[in-house]
């Protein structure tokens, strides 16, 4: 029987996506997130509110590695990568610990963290192994979070989905930059976009996105490819969406302005509070006008329009 290794990394909530993606890059076969906030204010399908639980500033990212992987080296490499990023993000005191578990435990252990989650008015994310019956008007996104990139319930993803609901009316061309799990592309298709082109620099993300897309019927209008932001892209779009770190976002803004159609939208998420002014000023300097600004905790998401200036703030 094969033995797996479970590496737990405790970090501030803001570091969830960053640490998850780094662990995948370092060979993890699956990642699970433990976050007390997942239960706070959550409402199930019958209107029952889950009991309040103690809200922690920290979350636990659990990564699973085969016994053949030297997890001590993974820990060392992760510490080194995180040390390079301390100027960009406050990760708090990073703590790590490793335990061994049998294959049957690995097969089920990470699944216990994932349940169907109603993310927006219309969209519900459902783990691929769950038998879930949609209610009237409910749109289902099937994901396999065991492969990589979490379940799509991170605040930056949630706000991106809200923004897509806000701007998509049907028939649009969408560019999804840094697609990760592919959740934003799948949502765009469900919300009526005609064509979606999804890009990611990471070959693992390209594969995972394609696999998640195939879990959802009728997604033939989504095209996934490896790409470095919008470099070399010549597709005009009605909507461009990017949920990546702020220091990377600013490098795609000029290309986004070139590619987005008049009256089109640029949705940007993954912006921590300290980087918001930098991103806003960069977008406005390129010619965009801020239409909507959403805030949840330390995270910011924004909707910019190419020609129209309507400002609004939604706080969360």
From Swiss-Prot:
Job of this protein? Methylates ribosomal protein L11.
The entry assigns this protein to a family as follows: Belongs to the methyltransferase superfamily. PrmA family.
Q: Which SUPFAM superfamilies match?
A: S-adenosyl-L-methionine-dependent methyltransferases (SSF53335)
**A molecular-function term among this protein's GO annotations:** protein-lysine N-methyltransferase activity
Name the residues that bind S-adenosyl-L-methionine: 157, 178, 200, 243
CDD domains reported for this sequence: AdoMet_MTases (cd02440)
Q: Which Pfam families match?
A: PrmA
Per the record, the GO terms for biological process are: methylation
Give the enzyme's EC designation.
Answer: 2.1.1.-
* Species of origin: Streptococcus pneumoniae (strain Hungary19A-6)
Please report the name of this protein according to its UniProt entry. Answer: Ribosomal protein L11 methyltransferase
InterPro entries linked to this entry = Ribosomal_L11_MeTrfase_PrmA, Ribosomal_PrmA_MeTrfase, SAM-dependent_MTases_sf
Q: Where in the cell is it found?
A: Cytoplasm
Protein's UniProt keywords contain DNA-binding: no
Substrates-to-products reaction catalysed: L-lysyl-[protein] + 3 S-adenosyl-L-methionine = N(6),N(6),N(6)-trimethyl-L-lysyl-[protein] + 3 S-adenosyl-L-homocysteine + 3 H(+)
Cellular component GO terms, alphabetical = cytoplasm
Keywords carried by this UniProt record: Cytoplasm, Methyltransferase, S-adenosyl-L-methionine, Transferase
